[in-house]
Amino acid sequence: MSLGLAGSLQAQLALEIVIQSLENCVLGPNQEKSLSVQNRVQDFQGASLLVCAREVIASNLSRPETPAPLQVPEMASLLSLQEENQLLQQELSRVEDLLAQSRAERDELAIKYNAVNERLEQAVRLETGELEAQEPRGLVRQSVELRRQLQEEQSSYRRKLQAYQEGQQRQAQLVQRLQAKILQYKKQCSELEKQLMDRSTELEQQRLRDTEHSQDLDSALLRLEEEQQRSASLAQVNAMLREQLDQANLANQALSEDIRKVTSDWTRSCKELEQREAVWRREEESFNTYFSSEHSRLLRLWRQVMGLRRQASEVKMGTERDLLQLGGELVRTSRAVQELGLGLSASLHRAESKAEAALEKQKLLQAQLEEQLQAKLLREKDLAQLQVQSDLDKADLSARVTELALSVEHLQNQNSEKDQVNRTLSDKLEALESLRLQEQTTLDTEDGEGLQQTLRDLAQAALSDTESGVQLSSSERTADTSDGSLRGFSGQRTPTPPRHSPGRGRSPRRGLSPACSDSSTLTLIHSALHKRQLQVQDMRGRYEASQELLGSVRKQLSDSEGERRGLEEQLQRLRDQTAASAQAQEDAQREAQRLRSANELLSREKGNLTHSLQVTQQQAKELRQELEKLQAAQEELKRQHNQLEDAQEDSVQEGARARRELERSHRQLEQLEVKRSGLTKELVEVREALSCAILQRDVLQTEKAEVAEALTKAEAGRAQLELSLTKLRAEEASLRDSLSKMSALNESLAQDKLELNRLIAQLEEEKVALLGRQQQAEHATTMAVEKQELLEQLRLEQEVERQGLQGSLCVAEQAREALEQQILVLRSERSHLQEQLAQLSRQLSGRDQELEQALRESQRQVEALERAAREKEAMAKERAGLAVKLAAAEREGRTLSEEAIRLRLEKEALESSLFDVQRQLAQLEARREQLEADSQALLLAKETLTGELAGLRQQVTSTEEKAALDKELMTQKLVQAEREAQASLREQRAAHEEDLQRLQHEKEAAWRELQAERAQLQGQLQQEREELLARMEAEKEELSKEIAALQQERDEGLLLAESEKQQALSLKESEKTALSEKLMGTRHSLAAISLEMERQKRDAQSRQEQDRNTLNALTSELRDLRAQLEEATAAHAQTVKELEERTGNLGRQREACMREAEELRTQLRVLEDTRDGLRRELLEAQRKGRDSQDSSEAHRQEASELRRSLSEGAKEREALRRSNEELRSAVKKAESERISLKLANEDKEQKLALLEEARVSVAKEAGELRASLQEVERSRLEARRELQELRRQMKTLDSDNGRLGRELADLQGRLALGERTEKESRREALGLRQRLLKGESSLEALKQELQGSQRKLQEQEAEFRARERGLLGSLEEARGAEKRLLDSARSLELRLEAVRAETSELGLRLSAAEGRAQGLEVELARVEAQRRVAEAQLGGLRSALRRGLGLGRVSSSPAREAPAGGSGDGLSSPSPLEYSPRSQPPSPGLIASPAPPDLDPEAVRDALRDFLQELRSAQRERDELKVQTSTLSQQLVEMEAERDHAASRAKQLQKAVAESEEAWRSADRRLSGAQAELALQEESVRRSKRECRATLDQMAVLERSLQATESELRASQEKVSKMKATEAKLESDKRRLKEVLDASESRSIKLELQRRALEGELQRSRLGLGDREAHAQALQDRVDSLQRQVADSEVKAGTLQLTVERLSGALAKVEESEGNLRSKVQSLTDALTQSSASLSSTQDKNLHLQKALSTCEHDRQVLQERLDAARQALSEARRQSSSLGEQVQTLRGELASLELQRGDAEGQLQQLQQALRQRQEGEAMALRSVQKLQEERRLLQERLGSLQRALAQLEAEKRDLERSALQFDKDRVALRKTLDKVEREKLRSHEDTLRLNAERGRLDRTLTGAELDLAEAQQQIQHLEAQVDVALEGNHNPVQPEAGEQQLELQQEVERLRSAQVQTERTLEARERAHRQRVSGLEEQVSTLKAQLHQELRRSSASVSLPPGTPEK
């Protein structure tokens, strides 16, 4: 008995320990199962101790399995809400960890309790088993005692549960304290935000300082411009230069037109020739194929032809007589050819191109004829097989002989008649073809006779062939005559083959007849054809050589003439530059006169040479003379360059330079002698060639004499040029003296001289390159001389051929007549060309004056060019002769333009010295007079040089032998110079590339520094955020300690959230997809940004490659110039084109460079303005950037100075204003040609600026978010205070305050999550918080808005009118802002910069506003979702209030019916606390539950579905109205007149609104006694609901009226169906809006849950509205008035349409200027910010109204007044709001209001739906207005030109990329945090897994131990069984009970162990399931985040790939 009592006491102690542990588990710090226990406690009255304990344990053990899976969805839902807020995520995760630990401990305790319970039962059973035999009654008493003790324990447990309830109340107090701490935390957050605002203000101040700095820079630029404008003389010279340059351009254009004409004629003739060649080739191929088939027959025919040749030799005697006659005729023809040569030399351009084309064609024709003759010879070898074809061959040969003669004469005489000749030839060929056909028919009919006739025809052909061949040469009386005639025959045949090939294709069918038997005739034919073949071959070779020589000579003449013209132009330019260096007008005029005299001398010499050029050799002489003239002119220019260059050198170096100049003069004289010797040699060779070319050597002798006379004239001219050279050198000496005198004044230029010395070194390298080019030109001249020699030899051969052509004298006479006519034409052309040359000389003289003034402006650069020219002259004197200088003059002239382009880049160092040089112009004026005196001395020196040249002429014979050696030396020098030129080019290219690389590196370094500083700033901001978050986390950790006490309430909240979890799961999936889309879009944006960076790098590299290619192009141009001398006729056209293009390109390049400089300035200013926001944080980077920019600016200033030298300085601003479009078009050229790297740098800088702007905007938005966060926190503080006050007022809710606090905490967590999400998405944050504020404020504002729904409709209509007025006002403000911007522009560059900056910024702002609108729509959807969640929480609060008012004291069923009525959600499953979602509420006396049957969740869901459908339809209608906007905007002009009427109507409506507000106030005054009538609140609420149903009916009527208005709008849309083309543009917007609507619908489910939770709190507020029943009639009256107002709103819809048309008229005015549109968009953006600010203030007021409503009736009145004021402020804000997002926000706010009022009155919901429709209509109107603004902006941007559009688009794209990059960075940071959180969760889960594994290991070890014990027990059992058996055998009766008892104990112990193992395994499995679910949830979140990142990346990439011109919707 004592053992039983001891066991029972031990069992009681164990039970007490278990109960204590259960209390610690249940009522301890975790407190998770209080409600469950509490629910179960009521059933414990009649149960036994064990049963109650088992039930408690079972309930606590069965529930962990449910929370574990429920925890995961809850956790998953929280994680799904993580994109809205991540601030409380860690806290929640820690709470969940604590819950998991508490559950684990609870499970362990439950297992232990079960074990203890089982042991207790076993002990009781054992005790009963032991004592049942002895003390059954004592055992019963003990069991009774134990039961009593258990009951006492149960009662104590119930007392503890009561204590737990009290603890729950204390927890409510803890919630309050927690809220106070949260408020403190919010205050700290607000302080931190204030600090951030201070930081943002500091950033703004820094930006202002940066703007001041930029203004200082602008002022510095202005001062620089003032310094540049100080030179008034320079401006005048610029004007004069512009005029003269225009004249020169006109002259150049005239010349270029002439050259184009000549070139076009030549190209056309070449094309025709090529076509004919192609035809001839085809014919030749056909002939080859045909005659190859007849080769065998020709072999047979050849034997017969031999006989024909013998007969042909007899004909030679007759042909010799004809040859004598032809000799005389040939003499006459040679004279005519000489006259023709004179005419050709005079024509030069036009005639030469035609003659060259003709000669080329003749050469090609002859070559082809010769090839055809060869083919014919091959065919003649097969004449044995062509017996049938012999008659056709005869006819063909005879026809071709005549045609050849005609074609030769036509080609030589008249190129213009070649087409006619070809036609005649084609006619003849056709005739021959017809003859062939006829003969073919005759041969088919008469074969035998045909063979005989064939032999006779062959004999006749041979005879005729020999006759033609005899005429080849008088000296060759044998086979050559027939050969030449045959060649002549075949030569005429060339044009004919295309027409005869078909006939020939049929000729093989005639080759079947037998051979003729007349062998003598055949032998004669064979011999004649053989001789003819030899003659044809000889004549063909000679004629080809002669034609090639003629073509090459003429090509050389044309090329040299083109080069001469280019050199003349360049010489004139250089002369102008030389004259400008002195800048003395009188001296410049003298120089111009001298240059003109030189030009006239050149023209006179050319005229003398044209008279002397009686033969083609004289053309070469004239070319050489002209080249000498050009060389002399170039030498003069070089001497002038030497003068100006010497003017810049130090006085110390002048003596050495003078000595070097003397040495150079001697070397130059030697070179002149060498050249003279070479020229004499060439003249001798030419004379010899002419003597060979003329029949009687005496003709060539006379021509030699004439050439000698021309040479003497050229030498005389050269002597004069030598004298001028000496004179210029004397002038140089005088300039040196004057410069030595002025050296004291030039001390200030020492630094500039050092820089110029560096430039000199560079120019020397360039000089080496130019000398190489000169040597190449010299080599080309030598080649030309050799070609001339070949030409002379070929002419000799041509004379022989001409002698052979005497046989065709009759035909030649006819051709001669045509030739004489052509000679007349050529003479006329020659005279015309001479006139053109005279005009060219006049134009060149005019260019002298023009370029003199131009060179005065660019004095500094001219001096550098002169220095380079002087050095080049020195090198030219040392290494080359006059011929080399002549060829190099063209190269130098060409490179001078290239050097000018390069010097533009080098002009940075020259710009400062330019002004000093300009100050020295007066001094140079005086020196100019000295130079004039020195020029006289130079004239004397020139005369002395003429004497010396006379002596040199005597040494010509001796120097001719040295010419060959000199040529070799020259070739070596040319090679060396070419190497030096290549080396200099490589060095220059390397230097240029180094400069480019240096600039690129500097830019990249600046970019990297800016990026680093930007990253540092972002890191600082992120660090601040992280610090803030760390502080928040610290405070959260502090709060988590108190939250641990609230975990029991959390468990209750989890039970309450069970109804929300299904919706949360669906929302989780939708938001997961959204987040995955965001992630994908962000990744795409990152990929796009990386691609953009790579593209920009590639662009920079490509631009570097372009620069390198530019240098390579220069080298290739040199190679092309070398090839021009070798490419003959093609080179002439190319040279002419190049000269022409260079002449035009020089001016265009100057203008383009000018535009480039201005554009670069503007771009620099744009960069400086855009960097204003960065300059505090990026001062170092700015200094580096300014260094690079200063260097680039110096280049730009240098380029601008060079361009200003070619532009009008005084008219620069006006010209630039007029040429805005030209500048834009020039920017494209400049970008592709000059500033590609600069643009790349500027793009990078712009990106930096955009990043900084985005950073500033982010900072601003952060400040705004902080302010909004403060407001949210303030509103939350007020809401919490109001909740506390409401709790104090309603003491019956104390038992449910804990849950209310938990729901508020959940709401706060969601709001915090929303805030975190707002930080992650920049645009969405402000709208989200505003809507959160609005949602929170609307919780209390809806209490008074039931009667204000009517006024809201009126306010909406007034808002539309206010929006119209706001738009008009914003338009006016935009105009004013544009005017101010235009007035504030200081110069054209700044204005252009401002315009572009404003374009880009306003485009960004517009896109940002549109993006904000979209973001606001998205955030509105989110706010609506959160609002619905808040409403769900209000439902829970309302149920709590109902239970607090007495429902909880009646029964559990009613206590749960109230929340079912208040917060039942059709989408959620009922919670354990909500038993009947459709049960009726209790009596009003017990509870003020306002949940009538009309608040059925299903009805609510149906209403919500209807509302969502209506919302979709309204949005569709809004989309349709968007299309109408574009049409209605056109009617805005007409609606201007109706706007006043609408305003009056608005006033009336405002009066009605005031009346309704007065009624509202009266209603509020009547609400004063509502607080004393709490018992009537439920009935009043029911009456209000009936009232709401009535209002719903009225709202249906209003909806129908609105549908009528919408039908009217659709009718108006049909009227403007022409504008529906813009629907395609709106499709994307519609899709986005649909997506937003889908997202909003998905979130609406979530917000519905929140809304139902908040309906409980709203129910409390409804308790104070008991007297609303008395005002039902007033509401009915107001509903009627609302219907009338809706009818009025239909009229107002028309007025709105008119207003939209007026707005379109106002917007039409905006088209007048682009700035107006930009300022409009800016004002709209400002209005958006103002409206958001006003909305936030309105929300604050609404919060105050909430507080006032919760306190007392007086506070309600104050709250009503504040609400009125808030509504007025809201109306003002709505008037100011013009953006789509704010209107959507307002509409969605109204939607939120309607959703919150749904539980109160369904009628109000319909009214608010009607209001929503109206708001959507207003939104559609606003969208149309915004769309119209966008369209107007696009139109204005299109007017700015293609460049500005491209720039704006690129800037918009860049800004989009930057914004997307920033957004991506933020998203990436958030995602990283999320991923870090997920990783931490994974780590926690891993740790849990490890812990569980450890526990499982421990349990396994325990299990193994238990198994071992079991095994031991089994062994003991077996042992005991054995003992029992033994005992049974020995002593059966006494041992049996003990063995049975032991066996029973062992079995019980085994069962207990097994049950413990099973329970342990179950627990472990439950934990593992929970862990797996948690891990799977985390993995799903990770995958969702990754998917969203990918989607965000795709979206960003898609947004980047959109057309830049497309505005963002």
Swiss-Prot record:
The record, for InterPro entries, names:
Rootletin-like_CC (IPR055167)
Comp. bias (Polar residues): 463-484
Q: What's a BP term from Gene Ontology annotated to this protein?
A: positive regulation of protein localization to cilium
Q: Which residues carry this modification: Phosphotyrosine?
A: 1475
Chief subcellular location equals: cytoplasm
Disulfide connectivity?
Answer: none
Q: In which tissues is it expressed?
A: Highest expression detected in photoreceptor cells of retina. Expressed at lower levels in brain, trachea and kidney. Detected in all major ciliated epithelia. During embryonic development, enriched along the apical domains of neuroepithelium in brain ventricular zone, in primordia of retinal pigment epithelia and in neural retina.
Identify the keywords attached in UniProt to this record, alphabetized: Cell cycle, Cell projection, Cilium, Cilium biogenesis/degradation, Coiled coil, Cytoplasm, Cytoskeleton, Phosphoprotein
What is the annotated localization of this protein? Answer: Cytoplasm, Cytoskeleton, Microtubule organizing center, Centrosome, Centriole; Cytoplasm, Cytoskeleton, Cilium basal body; Cytoplasm, Cytoskeleton, Microtubule organizing center, Centrosome
Q: Which GO terms describe its molecular function?
A: actin binding; kinesin binding; structural constituent of cytoskeleton; structural molecule activity
Which Pfam families would you find in this protein's record? Rootletin (PF15035)
Low complexity: bias regions: 577-586
* Null allele phenotype: Mice have no ciliary rootlets in ciliated cells.
Biased-composition ranges, Basic and acidic residues, are 656-665
Instruction: State whether it acts alone or in a complex, and with which partners, per the record.
Output: Homomer. Interacts with KLC3, NEK2 and the N-terminus of CEP250. Interacts with CEP44.
Q: Which family does it belong to?
A: Belongs to the rootletin family.
Q: Under what name is this protein listed?
A: Rootletin
